């Protein structure tokens, strides 16, 4: 079964047509049964979403939801938080992260939880941003690198926060960029168990490399990517030895099997390998497996 979702957010104004009152957010969620390729009963297109307190009136709204996980009878969706300045009609920077929570399977009791421990989006892009640990707690990635592949920024940050008993844990924050000592951006991470996780990340402090061309035929660029092993319990990181010239924005799925983490890595437009890392080892070196073949505008995006 798969979850289908959509959120709409439309600015609302008072009767005078000029006084901004907030955004009306409506969520649609459906269950797709792969066995029969039909939507199951319980589909809802009228979930009204309200932000806590005065955040809505202040211009905050959620513009996207993604990467749901299920824990203790609730779905947790990562969220892209936006803020609207009614006086200028333009977007402003935000100062918090949010998660959309709803009961499963009934799709009732929609709520938003928030934290100011980290700032940015929790919905990611294709790579999972949320992982449930052995205790049913949720590790969640927050990245303010937002436009990965854009201009390198010295303030790009990647954090892991924790959701416990349905709320953000105010005592927990893991800072990837802080431990690496350099600005970073990411789209998500993979949990290997017992607090160990692997995260592809963009090295925002390094010169950009060409990764392809845009629809207009112009070169497109990104800072090169790396891979790190995070110990989310002991607050440590190992920057793993991987090839230069990686671009992992599109990477979607890795595999953990028999204590090994598997990922396919190849520099842009070049051949590569399957890399295997021992989950229980802090060595930065992995083992090279099968060779992979790539060409212009070809990217490996997952292992299954």
Explain the meaning of each model-derived region.
Residues 1-16, 70, 130-135, 254-256:
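Eukaryotic scaffold repeat domains enriched in small/polar residues
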Residues 1-4, 42-61, 105-127, 166-187, ...:
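Surface-exposed loop and turn segments in beta-propeller and other repeat-based domains
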Residues 1-43:
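Post-signal peptide N-terminal segment of secreted/secretory-pathway proteins
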Residues 17-18, 24-30, 82-87, 145-149, ...:
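Short glycine/acidic-enriched loop and turn motifs that connect beta-strands
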Residues 29-43, 90-108, 153-169, 217-234, ...:
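Beta-propeller blade signature
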Residues 58-209:
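Acidic, serine/threonine- and glycine-rich low-complexity intrinsically disordered segments
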Residues 168-270:
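Intrinsically disordered, low-complexity segments enriched in Gly and acidic/Ser/Thr residues
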Residues 265-269, 280-304:
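Blade-level signature of beta-propeller repeat domains, shared across WD40, Kelch, NHL, RCC1
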């Amino acid at each position: 079964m798969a979850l289908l979702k959509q959120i709409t957010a439309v600015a609302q104004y008072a009767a005078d047509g000029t006084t901004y009152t907030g955004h009306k957010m409506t969520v649609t969620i459906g269950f797709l049964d792969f066995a029969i390729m039909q939507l199951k009963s319980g589909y809802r297109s009228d979930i009204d979403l309200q932000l806590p307190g005065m955040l809505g009136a202040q211009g905050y709204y959620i513009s996207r939801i993604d990467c749901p996980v299920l824990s203790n009878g609730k779905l947790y969706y990562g969220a892209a938080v936006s803020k609207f300045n009614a006086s200028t009609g333009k977007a402003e920077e935000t100062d918090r992260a949010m998660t959309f929570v709803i009961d499963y399977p009934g799709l009732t009791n929609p709520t938003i939880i928030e934290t100011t421990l980290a700032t940015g989006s929790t919905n990611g892009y294709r790579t999972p941003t949320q992982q449930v640990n052995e205790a049913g707690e949720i590790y969640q990635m927050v990245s303010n690198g937002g436009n990965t592949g854009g201009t390198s920024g010295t303030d790009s940050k990647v954090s892991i926060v924790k959701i416990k008993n349905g709320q953000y844990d105010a005592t927990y924050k893991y800072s990837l960029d802080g431990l690496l000592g350099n600005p970073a951006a990411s789209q998500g991470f993979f949990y290997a168990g017992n607090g160990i996780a692997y995260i592809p990340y963009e090295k925002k402090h390094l010169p950009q490399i060409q990764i392809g061309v845009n629809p207009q035929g112009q070169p497109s660029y990104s800072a090169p990517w790396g891979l790190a092993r995070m110990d989310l319990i002991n607050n440590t990181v190992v920057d793993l030895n991987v090839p230069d010239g990686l671009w992992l924005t599109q990477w979607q799925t890795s595999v953990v099997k028999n204590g090994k983490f598997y990922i396919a890595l190849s520099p842009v437009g070049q051949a590569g390998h399957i890399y295997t890392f021992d989950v229980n080892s802090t060595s930065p070196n992995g083992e090279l497996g099968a060779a992979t073949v790539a060409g212009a505008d070809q990217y490996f995006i997952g292992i299954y």
